[in-house]
Curated annotation (Swiss-Prot):
Subcellular localization: Cell membrane
Keyword list, A-Z: Bacteriochlorophyll biosynthesis, Cell membrane, Chlorophyll biosynthesis, Membrane, Photosynthesis, Transmembrane, Transmembrane helix
Keyword Transmembrane helix listed: yes
Protein origin, superkingdom: Bacteria
Transmembrane segments: 39-59, 67-87, 112-132, 134-154, 166-186, 187-207, 248-268, 287-307
Role played: Catalyzes the esterification of bacteriochlorophyllide a by geranylgeraniol-PPi.
InterPro entries cross-referenced by the UniProt entry: Chl_synth, Prenyltransferase_related, UbiA_prenyltransferase, UbiA_sf
UniProt GO MF annotations: transferase activity, transferring alkyl or aryl (other than methyl) groups
Membrane topology: Multi-pass membrane protein
Name recorded for this polypeptide: Bacteriochlorophyll synthase 34 kDa chain
Biased composition (Polar residues): 1-13
Cellular component GO terms, alphabetical: plasma membrane
Region (Disordered): 1-20
Protein's gene: bchG
Source organism of this protein record: Chloroflexus aurantiacus (strain ATCC 29366 / DSM 635 / J-10-fl)
Amino acid sequence: MSDMSDQTRLSSPPSLPLHKQPQSRYAWLVRSIQLMKPVTWFAPTWAFMCGAIASGALGWNESIGRLLLGMFMAGPILCGLSQVVNDYADREVDAINEPHRLIPSGQVSLRHVYILTAVLTWIGASIALFLGRQVAFFVALGLVFALAYSLRPIRGKRNGWIGNALVAISYEGLAWMAGHAAFAPLTGESVTIALLYSLGAHGIMTVNDFKSIRGDTIMGIRSIPVQYGKVMAARMVVTTMGVAQIAVIGLLFHWGHPVAATVVAILLAAQSIPNARFIRDPENNEVFFNATAIMLYVWGMLAAAIGLAA
């Protein structure tokens, strides 16, 4: 004679695996935000703000709302969209190397990805058009770069030079120029500074590649550390960031912004200690380098933007 628990088990329908169970709206939203990787939103959001400041047209009236809308577009919406596209493109590789991730584990279905991609694209395009045709152009170009980075046949992420350039230009240069164009016509000075900080950001993109050297080597991804080794790649990171900032300093002096140039120079000098530590052991000093040298770099972006606006 079976007990009550046995009868209950026999009469109850089998439970679905976790990833097969219906998701609530709250769970859908949480999974979507996880897929959009909020930790990546800072760079384009900051660059958009710097571009807006560099325009010299940013005030404390209705333009603040316009600024916040643009920052929301650059960070959570468009950067989030690029992360969704990248995870979708990597789903087969992740199923082998990182099966716990959202898409290969089944926590996020492909239908979820398609809907989220469509929603983010629509929101991003709508905001971009509202902010102006030039902003819409930079957004469209950034989306093309995101697709070229992640999807075949280009899949730029397979090569450190190409992939890092696509991301650096999108996250820094295009975001900066979109921020400027949202408030005033672009100037040659602002475009030049945006491109120089994009050059430096190419080095910053390499910092994330040191922790995945082994996996990248196995998968045939030719990141900068894979191609040149840890020490040389670390030197290239520091050199690229330094050259970009030295050029910014020189141009700011040349254009008659000595205070901004001096601030950027001080911030660059302060990077010397974390730079040396990073070169000695890039893998174990990645977090320290991000919190020091790269943070000083982005504060320099703000100083340069304020200088251009003066």
